[in-house]
Curated annotation (Swiss-Prot):
SUPFAM superfamilies: CinA-like, Molybdenum cofactor biosynthesis proteins. It comes from Leptospira borgpetersenii serovar Hardjo-bovis (strain L550). HAMAP family: CinA_B. It comes from the Bacteria. It holds the Pfam family MoCF_biosynth. The lineage of its organism: Bacteria, Pseudomonadati, Spirochaetota, Spirochaetia, Leptospirales. This is CinA-like protein. SMART domains: MoCF_biosynth. Belongs to the CinA family.
Length: 418
């Protein structure tokens, strides 16, 4: 089948009301991008059967102008009365439903293990086991509700998955993605990315993208996503050599500010080199430690973190001198240095990260403004490095900028020490 126009549809009144973010669509688009497919449109719909039906009908009518259309839809397959996707698809196709035997068995097992009578939940939970008649069933290895693939017209295919992110991601990778690759003639595309630290999207476009002839000529597609403390710059082309060349140019142009995904690379480095680390955090309140311990297996290298929010913890546990606090203040190079060195001793680790700053909105002075932050990167038997940064952002954003920067600074020191 020819290369399709791809449209991603998300349903949920919590999305259209702004109470939740649609993370599913961006995740799906990124996966499809890596498979060689580019999303041309995103659609977000409320839990309204009329709206869902009309939008699917409108999208299907695009088939008269397109060679092939692939709709990837999430949400509306659960047990509650506001789950309307199945109903809308069946009405559009003029078909009834049929039961997924696998889903039926999973839901019966689910209730039996919890000591509940399956019949008591029949009126609501049973809704999850049905798909449009004649569909290809997408099994749910995480939850209960199956997804399905069905045709809405000769050249329009619809793949529906649950809206729960954990269920959706597994179903996409295990069930839907293999079907897409088998069904459509995808272009063989190559992609790559880098994190560029302390960089804005507009600055990146001005000083790098605008000067690349291959991008101007349409030989490569580029994308950029702003994160807290860095941007993620990506390239895609049917030429592997061109993608590799763009990445090399990035590394040359930005130097140590250009990195791979350090949140994946740093744990690998720590495990490989058998390095242990710990943290001493003030203004980030343990966010750096959380980021490390979110990774499975982090106990092999992360020994612990000390949240020294109050000065008494800085002096009592980390050994920061009272004279240092009195003379230079809690937010200072000197305090960051003693915090990092105190963490090395208190936790018995090879490397440490310390951070102390003014998250705001109060606490700033003309000499030390809100957003000022100091980092210490300690290394056993080596000189502690101190770094000063300024992140004049709201409190939550400041904390993320600071946490990500602290992790980057450790990564950078390890790379230089290799």
């Amino acid at each position: 089948m020819s290369f399709p126009k791809v449209i991603v549809v998300s349903t949920g009144s919590e999305l259209t009301a702004g109470r939740s973010q649609d993370t599913n669509s961006s995740w799906i688009a990124n996966e499809l991008f890596g498979m060689g497919f580019t999303v041309s449109k995103f659609v977000v719909l409320p839990d309204d059967p009329v709206v869902i039906l009309e939008e699917l009908r409108t999208l299907t009518e695009l088939s008269m102008r397109e060679t092939s259309i692939l709709l990837v839809m999430t949400g509306g397959l659960g047990p509650t009365e506001d789950d309307y996707t199945l109903e809308a698809v069946c009405r559009l196709k003029g078909v009834t439903t049929e039961e997924s035997p696998v889903a039926r068995q999973r839901i019966e097992t689910f209730y039996k293990l919890r000591g509940r009578n399956f019949q008591e939940a029949m009126q609501t939970a049973i809704r999850q086991v049905f798909v449009p008649k004649g569909s290809i069933i997408l099994n749910n290895s995480v939850g209960i509700a199956p997804g399905f693939i069905t045709s809405l017209a000769e050249n329009v295919h619809l793949g529906c998955m649950p809206g729960v992110p954990g269920e959706m991601t597994e179903m996409f990778r295990e069930e839907l993605a293999p079907w897409i690759l088998k069904t459509y003639s995808s272009r063989e595309l190559y992609s790559g990315f880098r994190f560029i630290w302390w960089m804005s999207e507009s600055q990146f476009q001005k000083e790098f993208i605008s000067k690349e002839k291959a991008i101007a000529d349409g030989k490569a597609i580029w994308g950029v996503a702003a994160k807290r403390g860095y941007i993620r710059a990506s390239f895609q082309s049917d030429s592997r050599a061109l993608v590799d060349d763009l990445l090399r140019k990035l590394d040359t142009f930005y130097g140590t500010k250009s990195t791979p995904d350090i949140f994946e690379e740093l744990p690998r480095m720590l495990l490989e080199k058998k390095i242990t680390i710990g943290t001493a955090e003030s203004c980030t309140g343990g966010l750096i430690a959380k980021t490390f311990t979110d990774v499975p297996g982090s106990s092999a290298y992360f020994y612990g973190g000390i949240i020294s929010y109050d000065n008494s913890v800085k002096t009592g546990i980390l050994g920061v001198k009272r004279n240092t606090l009195d003379e230079f203040g809690a937010v200072s190079r000197e305090t960051a240095k003693e915090m990092a060195e105190g963490a090395l001793d208190a936790l018995g680790v090879d490397y440490s990260i310390s951070v102390t700053g003014i998250a705001g909105p109060g606490g700033g002075t003309p000499q030390k403004k809100v957003g000022l932050v100091y980092f210490g990167i300690g290394q056993k038997n080596e000189e502690t490095e101190i770094h000063e940064h300024y992140f004049p952002f709201p409190r939550s954003s400041f904390r993320e900028f600071a946490a990500h920067t602290g992790i980057y600074l450790l990564y950078d020191r390890l790379k230089r020490s290799a």
